[in-house]
Amino acid sequence: MANNPPQSSGTQFRPMVPGQQGQHFVPAASQPFHPYGHVPPNVQSQPPQYSQPIQQQQLFPVRPGQPVHITSSSQAVSVPYIQTNKILTSGSTQPQPNAPPMTGFATSGPPFSSPYTFVPSSYPQQQPTSLVQPNSQMHVAGVPPAANTWPVPVNQSTSLVSPVQQTGQQTPVAVSTDPGNLTPQSASDWQEHTSADGRKYYYNKRTKQSNWEKPLELMTPLERADASTVWKEFTTPEGKKYYYNKVTKESKWTIPEDLKLAREQAQLASEKTSLSEAGSTPLSHHAASSSDLAVSTVTSVVPSTSSALTGHSSSPIQAGLAVPVTRPPSVAPVTPTSGAISDTEATTIKGDNLSSRGADDSNDGATAQNNEAENKEMSVNGKANLSPAGDKANVEEPMVYATKQEAKAAFKSLLESVNVHSDWTWEQTLKEIVHDKRYGALRTLGERKQAFNEYLGQRKKVEAEERRRRQKKAREEFVKMLEECEELSSSLKWSKAMSLFENDQRFKAVDRPRDREDLFDNYIVELERKEREKAAEEHRQYMADYRKFLETCDYIKAGTQWRKIQDRLEDDDRCSCLEKIDRLIGFEEYILDLEKEEEELKRVEKEHVRRAERKNRDAFRTLLEEHVAAGILTAKTYWLDYCIELKDLPQYQAVASNTSGSTPKDLFEDVTEELEKQYHEDKSYVKDAMKSRKISMVSSWLFEDFKSAISEDLSTQQISDINLKLIYDDLVGRVKEKEEKEARKLQRLAEEFTNLLHTFKEITVASNWEDSKQLVEESQEYRSIGDESVSQGLFEEYITSLQEKAKEKERKRDEEKVRKEKERDEKEKRKDKDKERREKEREREKEKGKERSKREESDGETAMDVSEGHKDEKRKGKDRDRKHRRRHHNNSDEDVSSDRDDRDESKKSSRKHGNDRKKSRKHANSPESESENRHKRQKKESSRRSGNDELEDGEVGE
């Protein structure tokens, strides 16, 4: 088996077979090799010697979950045995009596002659494993033939040491060396490279193979721990870590328990390995300094590391492995205590103890708990019974299983045969199964616990299913009991129902009272639902009969009211079965159906009307098309004008009488829209033709002139005479409008220039163009005209208007003066008349006063003389003041009126050529309005003068 290539990491279970027979130790005559556990006869064997005690071994890959153990020099350890038929290929097997004795071991009595020679390892890692094989058959008590064995992890280097048994039996013992790589491919065989796209890959120099995945040999203990689980760690772009399960496709933010446990165990194993290496002495050092082997046991130190395939690491469990050693004379065996080994006695470990302690690390990563469980298991097996070296262990051979699944199934069948319950603990189960041969189907405690936990989970599921099925059946029987009870109704209470069913076994089959009540409540709810459904069905039948009755009543129409016929309906038996509200609802539903029928009839009638209206619209469209062909309807036709011509036609009247759809105006606009579109296309073509041939439109052209000018272009484009006439009218209108616009612009410039001339006081009636040109030639108005002759003509017109204004002003001043003189004379005449009248009145008053004052003539005459003199003086002064004010007022009126006339004349001349608004202003300033204003002023003056006269005459104002 050692010559075969290493198995793949996917192999989970591999049965061991007995080693090949016929391979003998070289050069001495040795007996054939037998598997561990075989009890050979006592034969005298020559003392072998080690050829390569620390040679690195080439082993099979470690099965996932294979535990690895560390031992110290003071405690025993159970190590995984490695079965191989590899024989020693180098070194001498002859004894060396002159070799120095070994030191560092606890011995008593004379030292043994060393039967072994320790040779340092000098072979490369690629060479096959060299195990020390004595010339006699090796035997380990308690290890059955073809037992399931697992190899040591890939990063562990061990050598097997077999001390001599004088009785002819030897036991291979694993001796610890520095931790190394025990895999067929060492870390030095792998090289890391980087591909063109930046990805890293690994190349094996020995196998000439490349791999994208990082080999186990190059992994750190932490990476091996991660690789042993189904979880893989990733990092988001934000730097947050999450974990992905490769089996269940599950992602989570928190670190899974198994991954966390694997990392902790890897860290713990690494720390304890370093401590173990620091506290132990290499075995080669003792071999070099000692010539006699004076030990009764050889302690194996196996550093624990992470499993190469599963990544699970275990806590170091230290135990002493006792190897029987005999020397003459015979020494009675002594049982050691607390790991201490006697000087002269050899101890052996019972086969069950070795079997149960072959590996103590479980797949779930338990460390200290596994140690405690293993100690309990050892106590169950007999508390590590030790027997004399000469006793032969009667070991029952375990069954061999082809696969790991079969072994696990056998172990589960053992649990099932013992009838392990789902609430049993491992310690409780261990007492029942430890003596069964199927207990050894799984080698490690972790595998057994894993299978035990799986069995408990399955057992719990089975028990839960059985419990659920039993409860389901009890519930069904309970419901059946309720259905069979005739006294049960929807109004029955639970308290009364309990008294009815308390003696029934089906009632007692449901354990929990709460469940019984829930089942009862559910049944009552279902019973109520059925009763409601039955009542609803009866109600539907009554409503159907009532509906048939309503349909037979001919006096019910769509507009019939309920209040008028409800008394007539109540006499029928089909109405008495229903409530009043139900009868009302049924009546309303029937009325709604009648209304729907009427609406359907209306819809059909409306459809007929719609078709007739559509025919009317089609006839009107035909009429419009005829008018378009005749030229009556064009793109420039307005609806109001066209409607006057159509209003008496039957097609128009038919469409106008339509109640829906397009109106006659809508149809007219649809046609004119198409005509306008064609008109604009023809107009664009004509304008492009005129532009290409450089034809300028003249406002004096007739239609024939325009048509002849573009006749050559009309041969390529068919344009109707109607559209061509419309195009002509539009172009001529545009030309005329442009000319009018230019004329208005020139008139505006002339007005602006004339207004500019008004602003210069230097320009008078006597000014000429040559002298005044320098005043206006820098202005914007003058430059806007651009033609000096036009500006000069406007200037001369302005001078002429000034001359006319001056003449008119002089004439008006003369007329005003004559008028005022005439008014003054008339006013004097009126004043004289008034004065004479007042004199006469005074005379009459005087006469009356004379008659009254005859008796006081003397006194009265004196008083009258004084009074009359004073009044005469006062009247004379007032006459002088009035004349002075009148002269001053007349002069100021003449000046104001002349200035106002000048301003009016200037405004009239500046707005002589304006628009309607300017004309209206001109009209407001016409001579007629001036005469009216003058009349108003004269009236005011006359009233003012008359008021002054009244004040002068004295009696009122004074």
UniProtKB/Swiss-Prot annotation:
Highly expressed in roots. Expressed in shoots, rosette leaves, cauline leaves, stems and flowers. Residues 805-857, 867-880, 897-908 have a biased composition (Basic and acidic residues). SMART domains: FF, WW. It comes from the Eukaryota. Keywords: mRNA processing, mRNA splicing, Nucleus, Phosphoprotein, Repeat. Residues 184-217, 225-258 form the WW domain. It is found in: Nucleus. Disruption phenotype: No visible phenotype, probably due to the redundancy with PRP40B and PRP40C. Gene3D superfamilies: 2.20.70.10, FF domain. One of its GO terms (cellular component) is mediator complex. GO terms for biological process: mRNA cis splicing, via spliceosome; RNA splicing. The keyword Lipid metabolism does not apply. Residues 909-924 have a biased composition (Basic residues). CDD domains: WW (cd00201). InterPro entries: FF_domain, FF_domain_sf, Prp40-like, WW_dom, WW_dom_sf. Residues 404-458, 471-526, 532-593, 611-674, 679-734, 736-801 form the FF domain. Residues 1-54, 89-132, 158-193, 270-292, 328-391, 805-958 are annotated as: Disordered. Residues 40-54 have a biased composition (Low complexity). Residues 1-12, 110-132, 158-189, 270-283, 335-347 have a biased composition (Polar residues). Baeckstroem et al identified PRP40A in a Mediator complex pull-down assay and suggested that PRP40A could be a plant specific component of the Mediator complex. However, no experimental evidence has been brought so far to confirm this hypothesis. Belongs to the PRPF40 family. Binds the phosphorylated C-terminal domain (CTD) of the largest subunit of RNA polymerase II and functions as a scaffold for RNA processing machineries. May be involved in pre-mRNA splicing. This is Pre-mRNA-processing protein 40A.
